[in-house]
């Protein structure tokens, strides 16, 4: 007969600290991603055309806003409502499923950005890569629409799988009297849903890794050319290579950390019932979107100019603010 794993609870102070940290990560992520969205939306309001990179960043930041909200809900659910004797409640499974979908959409958009950087920066010498790079540059908006359509299809499939497995789990619970066996069925169903939802991440992961690898190889070739020609260090092509690679490597690192934290949280939740370990994993997952948004802002000239304009406006408002002096009394 199966035996239940001992439940590892956390103290009230740990829950309060976790909620405070989650709220701080949520605030930073919302501010950073909302700033990217507002800057680009303001350009649209002023009827200034957005380039392909701005459109992709706008879509990515909107996805990140949704992602940050889900992670905050996940933290509140875990700290306040989650009973570790029943770790796979329907609400918790729904939040994690939506997080997997939003994370997959952000990966698709990052793959599109990686392909765009590759087509704009890398100087190809063969015919086929030249045609592919030209097609990506000319048809980027159509490619983005196809990616969003594929994301919608993956979302529908993941939600269909989630609701079907939830229905089968409820049905098995009604027909079985063994609580332990019912928990095992719920764990298996959620594990299969996790695998099914992440299968759609394979194509964008491959596209992201291939285009990023091409950029790294191109950077190495460009640096060797610069050394042989003794070029100056202010080469714009070199700077474009470095900015693109910083964006891609940072996204890849944050994505791997987030995915590994989500992967580790599953056995912590289902097998060991360790709420403290799951809290650490969720804190790491919530830090990734906000951290990458900060890197995006620091590496984008348009967003940096917007921050400088805002700071200048605040400083000028402080200087212009009149000082009210009390008039002297007359006898």
Curated annotation (Swiss-Prot):
Instruction: State which residues carry a glycan (glycosylated).
Output: 177
Q: Which residues lie on this side of the membrane: Cytoplasmic?
A: 39-55, 116-142, 211-243, 298-331
Q: Which Gene3D superfamilies match?
A: Rhodopsin 7-helix transmembrane proteins
Kindly list the biological process annotations in GO that this record carries: detection of chemical stimulus involved in sensory perception of bitter taste
Q: Which parts of the chain span the membrane according to its record?
A: 18-38, 56-76, 95-115, 143-163, 190-210, 244-264, 277-297
> In which tissues or organs does this protein occur?
Low levels in tongue, stomach and duodenum.
**What family does the entry list?**
Belongs to the G-protein coupled receptor T2R family.
Its function?
Answer: Putative taste receptor which may play a role in the perception of bitterness.
Extra facts: Several bitter taste receptors are expressed in a single taste receptor cell.
UniProt name for this protein? Taste receptor type 2 member 38
Record organism: Mus musculus
Q: Which gene encodes it?
A: Tas2r38
């Amino acid at each position: 007969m199966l035996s239940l794993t001992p439940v590892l609870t956390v103290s009230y102070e740990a829950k309060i600290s976790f909620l405070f940290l989650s709220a701080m990560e949520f605030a930073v992520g919302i501010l950073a991603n909302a700033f990217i969205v507002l800057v680009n939306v303001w350009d649209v309001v002023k009827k200034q055309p957005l380039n392909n990179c701005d459109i992709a960043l706008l879509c990515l930041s909107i996805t990140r806003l949704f992602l940050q909200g889900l992670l905050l809900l996940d933290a509140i659910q875990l700290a306040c409502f989650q009973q570790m004797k029943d770790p796979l409640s329907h609400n918790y499974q729904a939040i994690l499923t939506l997080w997997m979908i939003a994370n997959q959409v952000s990966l698709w958009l990052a793959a599109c950005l990686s392909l765009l950087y590759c087509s704009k920066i890398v100087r190809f010498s063969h015919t086929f890569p030249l045609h592919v790079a030209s097609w990506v540059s000319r048809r980027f908006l159509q490619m983005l629409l196809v990616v969003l359509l594929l994301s919608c299809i993956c979302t529908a499939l993941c939600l269909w799988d989630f609701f079907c497995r939830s229905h089968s789990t409820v049905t098995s619970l009604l027909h079985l009297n063994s609580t332990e066996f019912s928990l095992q069925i719920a764990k298996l169903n959620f594990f299969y849903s996790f695998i099914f939802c992440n299968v759609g991440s394979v194509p964008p992961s491959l596209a992201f890794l291939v285009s990023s690898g091409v950029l790294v190889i191109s950077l190495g070739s460009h640096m060797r050319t610069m050394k042989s020609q003794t070029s100056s260090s202010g080469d714009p092509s070199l700077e474009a290579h470095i900015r693109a690679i910083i964006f891609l490597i940072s996204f890849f690192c944050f994505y791997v950390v987030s995915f590994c934290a989500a992967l580790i949280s599953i056995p912590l939740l289902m097998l060991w019932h360790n709420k403290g370990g799951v809290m650490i994993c969720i804190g790491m997952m919530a830090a990734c979107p906000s951290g990458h948004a900060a890197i995006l802002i620091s590496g984008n000239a348009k967003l940096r100019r917007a921050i400088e304009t805002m700071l200048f406006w605040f400083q000028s408002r402080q200087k212009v603010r009149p000082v009210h002096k009390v008039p002297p009394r007359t006898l």
